[in-house]
Structures are given as structure tokens and as C-alpha cells.
Amino acid sequence: MGKIRLAVIGVSGRNKMDFNLLSKEMFDYMIDNVEAYIKYHLETSNDKIVLVSGGSAWADHSVVKLFLEKNFAGLELYLPTEFTNGKFKDSHQGSILNNLHKHFSEQIGENSLDQIFDCILDPNCKVSVHNGFFKRNTLIAEESDHVIAFTFDEKPKGGTLDTWNKIKHNNKLNINLSIYL
């Protein structure tokens, strides 16, 4: 059996209401759920998993953190803009992502942009840059075998819904974080 590509998408802190609900504990809860999905649903080991991220804060970043701390087969970063000199390029998408990561880093007490940079330096990390969030979302949907979405709703919305609707398989799970509150 080949490697399984597992993407994590969802809440990024962009919505002010969502941001006010997010915490370090909730980020850890996301990480725990990804690990449980691999162990109990996929019934495989980390070295058989390639993690997939869109480079945003919170949900997307859970797999960046896992890649840095555990023995995964790889990480694929599908970014909506270039990442250079430890931050996203100064563009519309880059400004949004840099701001999200600034606030996220303050909440969790770690520098998430440094963590992305560390991943990019790893030979088991593949980086693919696409112009814009929707193009990035399309690639994540097309290239992932399984997808976990962390949202505050029964059904994804916004950019997460865009990715969700582009997924052509049924190996997708929406985890409603409202139950954690």
C-alpha cells in the first residue's frame, strides 16, 4: 500500500467570532484528533502518512506541528503565495496569512512562521505555490486521499467549504469544534 495523503483544513482565525473561541488548548485538541484519525480510522502508522496543509493558521497548521514533532512520511504545503525570508510574500494573500499567523503565534506561544520555515528546509517537505486561495484549495482537494475539516459548524463554510465541495471522494470528516466549548 502506498502513502496516504491526509489534509487538514478549516478554521484559520480569519473570522473574528471564530478567533475569539480559539485557544492553545483547542489547537492541541485538533492535533489530538488528527492523531486519533490516523490511529483509529486509517489504522496505520505515521510513516505511511503524507500530511497536507494550505499554510494557514490554526487547523492547517496542526499538520505542520505534527510533521515537526512526529515521524511522518512527508508534508505537502500548498501555498497561495510565496514564502520567503520567514514570512509570506507581501501580497493580498500574504498579508492575510502573515496577520493570521501573528495572532495565532501569540495565542499558542510559539512562532508558527518559523515552524513553516523549518518544514520548508526539511527534504521530506514539498512546497507548491499557487496564485490565490481558491487555486490552492483546488489542489488540496485534488491531491488528498483523506481530509479533516475543523470548523465551528455542522457543515464547513467560506474557504473551507470551497475546498470541501471540490473533494471528489467521501473520505472527508468535518469536526465541529463547538462541542469542545
Curated annotation (Swiss-Prot):
It comes from the Viruses. The lineage of its organism: Viruses, Varidnaviria, Bamfordvirae, Nucleocytoviricota, Megaviricetes. This is Uncharacterized protein R261. It comes from Acanthamoeba polyphaga mimivirus.
